[in-house]
Amino acid sequence: MTKKAFLVLEDGSIYPGESFGYEGEAYGEIVFNTSMTGYQEILTDPSYAGQIVVPTYPLLGNYGITSSDIESSQIQVSGFVVRQYCEEPSHTEVTGTINEYLTSQEIVGISEIDTRAVTRKIRSKGVMMGVITVNISPEQALQQLKNKPSYDEQNFVQKVTTNERYQWTESGLGYDHIADNLRILVSDYGLKYNILRILKGKGCDVEVFPSSATSNDLLAQNPDGILLSPGPGDPELLDHLVTTTEDILGKVPVMGICLGNQILAKSLGAKTYKLKFGHRGANHPVKDTASGRIYITAQNHGYSIDPESLPSDVTVTHISMNDYTVEGIRHRSLPALSIQYHSEASPGPKDNEYIFDDFLEMVKETK
């Protein structure tokens, strides 16, 4: 028999539903994602650490869980809120249901929620903390929530980064080998596997380092380039990553994605700020300021670069066509570029993988 469950927001809003996945309590920042597919990639994206994710699409789990759709070693979200989930998925590679997947990793979910009503709340009020509760009352859960640290107070990068450096060997399919034998190091702030697949597929020698690696640790490897990965949390808490990036700028080409974009910007003297409800979905239009071309991008971020704080030697290369926030920057003289959206997609459109080519061409030019 299905147990009752409740989604409780920090403003006191209570949404009754039914438990699925693991039965317990889950605390986190409530965010919504507008993607229609790709739920397994979303669940395993480390950038969602500390967050309870609300997909706006009403039916989740219809193609089940597969071994090929993971973006990290485990589920990363704190909780999952859905309107409805499928108990009998259909897929040639299915290994289980979404309910079984959440249960096996002790991730709390709630179904039968009006997810679009929750989304409207977040759009109008902004992101806020919340809790999914199964075993205690909504009133008790709200009281416990008040004693939990806010999302912005927690360093999630140190929770999701790798503990040890490792070589990546799995190659993505269908890529031109434009970068044979280029040695690329990836600083793991909470990376997705598809970044590594793309780099390897293009011919790179790829090694991943923990976020605690110093500039000396990285430069001692004599890399041809360094990629600053996506990741969760507030960049204001990550001064050590900014310092490390400052130390490597000008010594080796650098590319940043999402959180890596914010870290690069801060290392160049810019400031960041929190968005009201962030950008999370697979259909965000972004304009390339040089060509004027519009790309549809996958996004997952809650912070952005303050364009007024960018120094004069940094140019804005991409902007959001939804709210005109900064979506990419490039230094005018140093070999450094970054983007706010997810060029690796997973899930989402692959139109923007050309950014990896731009980075690798920059690396080859500086060798």
Walk through the language-model features, giving the residues of each.
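RNA-binding accessory domains that recognize and position tRNA/RNA substrates
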Residues: 1-216, 221, 235, 346, ...
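Flexible loop residues that form catalytic
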Residues: 85, 231, 334, 344
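Proline-centered loop/turn at the N-terminus of a beta-strand
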Residues: 108, 183, 253-255, 271, ...
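Active-site glycine-centered loops adjacent to acidic/histidine catalytic or metal-binding residues
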Residues: 114, 258, 301, 342
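Active-site-proximal beta-strand elements of phosphoester/diester hydrolases
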Residues: 183-188, 297-298, 337-341
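Cysteine-nucleophile active-site neighborhood
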Residues: 224-225, 229-296, 304, 348-366
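Catalytic beta-strand/loop cores that center a nucleophilic Ser/Cys/Thr
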Residues: 292-334
